[in-house]
Amino acid sequence: MKVKIINKSNNPLPKYSTIGSSGMDLRAYTENDITLKPLERTLIPTGIYISIPEGYEIQIRPRSGLSIKHGITLINCVGTIDSDYRGEIKIPVVNLSNEEYTISTGDRICQMILQKYENIEFAEVEVLDETDRNDGGFGHTGY
């Protein structure tokens, strides 16, 4: 699928790392290094602007290696960029480690995944269909 992109950074365009990759890494684009203290959070600019096709969203997800090795992850776990957004993609990160971590231009900071979605049209009713589970919630299937 062809998707329009503006790259105002000096980083390469996002690309798939392997033939089976579902996500592309996004890279930081900053004038100066950004050092995050423990539990500090900030928005990391990418210099990337994307025209997302209608009926799709871009999901922003943490990079597993960055999370497990350095405690750097996304504030909202999975972020959504809507198809009508045209601003710069900025990544909300948090340092969950006990050590400072520095992010520099070109560092891979998250993954983006293009995802199709359907809009919901609610049909208001008085009763929902029954299932084997019904209203069994947290812990219902065991711990």
UniProtKB/Swiss-Prot annotation:
**GO annotations under biological process?**
dUMP biosynthetic process; dUTP catabolic process
Q: Which GO terms describe its molecular function?
A: dUTP diphosphatase activity; magnesium ion binding
* Binding-site residues for substrate, renumbered to this chain: 63-65, 76, 80-82, 90
Q: Which reaction does it catalyse?
A: dUTP + H2O = dUMP + diphosphate + H(+)
Cofactors that this protein relies on: Mg(2+)
Keywords from UniProt, A to Z, are: Hydrolase, Magnesium, Metal-binding, Nucleotide metabolism
Intrachain S-S bonds: none
Q: EC number(s)?
A: 3.6.1.23
Pfam families assigned to the protein according to its UniProt record, in alphabetical order:
dUTPase (PF00692)
InterPro entries according to UniProt: dUTPase, dUTPase-like, dUTPase-like_sf, dUTPase_trimeric
According to its UniProt record, this protein's enzyme class is hydrolase
The protein's annotated pathway: Pyrimidine metabolism; dUMP biosynthesis; dUMP from dCTP (dUTP route): step 2/2
Q: Which family does it belong to?
A: Belongs to the dUTPase family.
Q: What does this protein do?
A: This enzyme is involved in nucleotide metabolism: it produces dUMP, the immediate precursor of thymidine nucleotides and it decreases the intracellular concentration of dUTP so that uracil cannot be incorporated into DNA.
- What protein name does the entry list? Deoxyuridine 5'-triphosphate nucleotidohydrolase
Q: Which organism is it from?
A: Finegoldia magna (strain ATCC 29328 / DSM 20472 / WAL 2508)
Q: Which gene codes for it?
A: dut
